[in-house]
């Protein structure tokens, strides 16, 4: 898998879990990015290293192909949204789809939560001292302890955690199963939540097969609702709410492991990545994160001039 393909996969995953994009939308965007990659490959480029001139040439090519205006507009939109995502993740310093380079001084930082921010987020969730607070704390602990995708978290059956296991069996992309470890903090959070879980059961039901049931139409929590709850907790914790999402918690799991010296292949297995190229994204994110810490926290790094 090339770097461009890995970035495209990460973008589509974000669209699925954070924006709850419909399957048809994800399929269309996947084809749009594949179309762009096909054009870029003719000049020896891919999505990760394309320059503004090449992207502009691609946009002009869309207009010359005789595509319907709606299709051409959607493909431009897909590419622009992709590069906004890449810029926001800190994987590039510019947005070639808009011919505007971000100045070095204002380079966006990778969306990585510090360890103390994770603790503040958990404290804000637990401070509610309610069933909702315990549920949110449980979800945060599970994602941060095991690197679960939000779709994997919300698909967990109650039986998966009913007996206080040290590991979860997670069914990921393509139906592939993997083992996800649980630390003591996550197991304690699950125990505390299970006591309050009946408060979330649909009316008229004595139980639900899901670990995180809901009274909504689906019978279980949705990714969008989890995102809203995390944003509320971020505000309460004094953290930029745009910096917090289920996907970013998964990022934090991987980045903090890498910074702690974990092998990249181990992280690949824990995240359920089919290709190591997808996991290698985190080596860049971790490097940027550590450089920022040195620049802002080290006494010499803060000196000007």
From Swiss-Prot:
Which PROSITE patterns does this UniProt record tie to the protein? CB (PS51900), TYR_RECOMBINASE (PS51898)
A GO BP entry: chromosome segregation
Q: Which residues form a coiled coil?
A: none
- Domain of life, per UniProt, equals Bacteria
Q: Keywords assigned by UniProt?
A: Cell cycle, Cell division, Chromosome partition, Cytoplasm, DNA integration, DNA recombination, DNA-binding
> What residues does the Core-binding (CB) domain cover?
2-87
In the UniProt record, does the keyword rRNA processing occur?
no
Q: Which positions fall inside the Tyr recombinase domain?
A: 108-295
Enzyme active site: 149, 173, 247, 250, 273, 282
Q: What InterPro entries does the annotation carry?
A: CB (IPR044068), DNA_brk_join_enz (IPR011010), Integrase-like_cat_sf (IPR013762), Integrase_catalytic (IPR002104), Integrase_recombinase_N (IPR010998), Integrase_SAM-like_N (IPR004107), Recomb_XerD (IPR011932), Tyrosine_recombinase_XerC/XerD (IPR023009)
Q: What is its main location?
A: cytoplasm
Give the family per the record: Belongs to the 'phage' integrase family. XerD subfamily.
Q: What does this protein do?
A: Site-specific tyrosine recombinase, which acts by catalyzing the cutting and rejoining of the recombining DNA molecules. The XerC-XerD complex is essential to convert dimers of the bacterial chromosome into monomers to permit their segregation at cell division. It also contributes to the segregational stability of plasmids.
The record's section on HAMAP family has: Recomb_XerC_XerD (MF_01808), Recomb_XerD (MF_01807)
Name used for this protein in its record: Tyrosine recombinase XerD
Question: What organism does this protein naturally occur in?
Answer: Caulobacter vibrioides (strain ATCC 19089 / CIP 103742 / CB 15) (Caulobacter crescentus)
Gene field: xerD
């Amino acid at each position: 898998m090339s770097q461009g393909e890995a970035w495209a996969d990460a973008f589509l995953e974000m669209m699925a879990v954070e924006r709850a994009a419909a399957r048809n939308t994800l399929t269309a965007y996947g084809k749009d990015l594949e179309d762009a990659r096909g054009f870029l490959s003719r000049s020896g480029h891919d999505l990760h290293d394309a320059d503004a001139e090449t992207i502009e040439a691609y946009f002009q090519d869309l207009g010359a192909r005789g595509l319907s205006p709606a299709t051409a507009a959607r493909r431009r939109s897909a590419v622009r949204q992709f590069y906004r995502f890449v810029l926001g993740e800190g994987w590039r310093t510019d947005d070639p789809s808009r011919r505007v380079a971000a100045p070095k001084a204002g380079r966006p930082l990778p969306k990585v939560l510090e360890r103390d921010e994770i603790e503040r987020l958990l404290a804000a969730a637990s401070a509610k001292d309610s069933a909702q607070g315990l549920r949110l704390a449980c979800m945060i602990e599970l994602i941060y302890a095991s690197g679960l995708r939000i779709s994997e978290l919300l698909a967990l059956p109650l039986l998966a955690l009913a007996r206080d296991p040290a590991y979860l069996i997670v069914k990921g992309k393509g139906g592939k199963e993997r083992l996800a470890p649980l630390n003591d903090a996550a197991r304690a959070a699950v125990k505390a939540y299970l006591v309050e879980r009946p408060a979330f059961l649909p009316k008229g039901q004595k139980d639900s097969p899901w670990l995180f049931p809901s009274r909504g139409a689906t019978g279980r929590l949705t990714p969008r609702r989890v995102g809203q709850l995390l944003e509320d907790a971020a505000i309460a914790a004094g953290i930029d709410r745009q910096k917090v999402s289920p996907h970013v918690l998964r990022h934090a799991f991987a980045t903090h492991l890498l910074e702690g010296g974990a092998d990249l292949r181990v992280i690949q297995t824990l995240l359920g990545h089919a290709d190591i190229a997808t996991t290698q994204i985190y080596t860049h994110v971790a490097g940027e994160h550590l450089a920022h810490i040195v620049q802002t926290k080290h006494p010499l790094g803060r000196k000007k001039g």
